[in-house]
Amino acid sequence: NDVGLLTGSFLKKTALDVLDGNPDINYGSIYENAVAQELRAHGFDLYYYNSKKLGELDLLIQDRNDHVLPIEVKSGKSYKRHRAMDNVLAHPEYHLNTGYVLGPCNVSVEGNVTYLPVYMAGMFHNE
């Protein structure tokens, strides 16, 4: 995963829109790629979760204490909507204590979900 390669593959107009901060662009793939790149740089193996019953999670990582951490990356104002995250956290067989949503937000905690700005992906360390 490389954000530079990803944005380099965009059409010229799309690349200019990204650089100009055009709010009509879906930044989801860029945010997801940036978060994945940052987590990988900090020593995490990255996993993806998809279940017809529970939904899709962008990333799963395992911390040094062997806890599985589900991560959703959001790019829009609806970052507090995360059905799959809620489903996985509530699943009795998974025993997950907390999930993380990285998006266009401030640091906050609501229930068992921690919201972080995308730039804080570098705060996860696995060394």
Provide a role label for each language-model segment.
Residues N1-E127:
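A cross-kingdom feature that marks ATP-driven nucleic-acid transaction machinery
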